[in-house]
C-alpha cells in the first residue's frame, strides 16, 4: 500500500492575502487601486475609478463612496457637486486584493457619469476589421438629449 505523504513545505506568503480573512489591500506603485462601481439593485456597471488608501478609508468609515481623482490630484467624494452621491451597499475585493468592486445606490438623478448618463459605459466598440466605430447603446441620457445618443465617432482600430 502506497500512501501519499502531505508536504510540510512552507506556505505560500500570498495565500493569506488570497485565501485568508484579513483585509489587506494592495495599492500600486502610484498608490492607487482600481474600483469598479456597480448599481446594487440592477447589477449594471456604472463606472470605473481609482481609490487610494485615504479614499478607501473614507468610504469604509462613512458608507459614502470616495475616489482619488487622478486629474485633480485630490480626494473626491462622489456626488459633492452633482448630487449623485453613491452609498456603499457592499464592497468586494479581488483575489489578490488590488481591485475593488463597490455595489452602490445612487442619490439624485441616479447618474454616475459626468456626461449626465447613468453609466460611463454608454458606447459599444464595433469594428469591421480595419476601422473601429463607437456606437451609443443607452437609449437616452439623463438630461434627455437623445440626439447625442445617435452620434457615432470613428477611429482607426490599428495605428497608421
For the regions a protein language model found, what residue spans apply to each?
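C-terminal binding/interaction regions
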Residues: 3-32, 38-46, 51-160
